[in-house]
Curated annotation (Swiss-Prot):
PROSITE patterns: RIBOSOMAL_S19. One of its GO terms (molecular function) is structural constituent of ribosome. The gene is rps19. This is Small ribosomal subunit protein uS19c. It is found in: Plastid, Chloroplast.
């Protein structure tokens, strides 16, 4: 279930301050954040945000197609290492 349209999208205050500061300066630098729950808003377009996945920060370039999604959707936390090998054939 999505968030109510009466409410504004959630964006962490510290992240919003950093983006607004870079927009006023006109600079582009990597913004490091742990806030995976923040929603991508149009003022973030064109910035590179390094999102924490539990182990490291993955740099993600924000495009216009990402608006409305959460930051955490673009930094996977689990790595698939393959299914467990079944050794029943070698035991026979």
């Amino acid at each position: 279930m999505g968030r109510s349209l009466k409410k504004n999208p959630f964006v962490a205050n510290h992240l919003l301050r950093k983006i607004n500061k870079l927009n006023t300066k006109g600079e582009k630098e990597i913004i490091i954040t742990w806030s995976r729950a923040s929603t991508i808003i149009p003022t973030m377009i064109g910035h590179t945000i390094a999102i924490h996945n539990g182990r490291e920060h993955l740099p993600i370039y924000i495009t216009d197609r990402m608006v409305g999604h959460k930051l955490g959707e673009f930094s996977p936390t689990l790595t698939f290492r393959g299914y467990a090998k079944n050794d029943t054939k070698s035991r026979r």
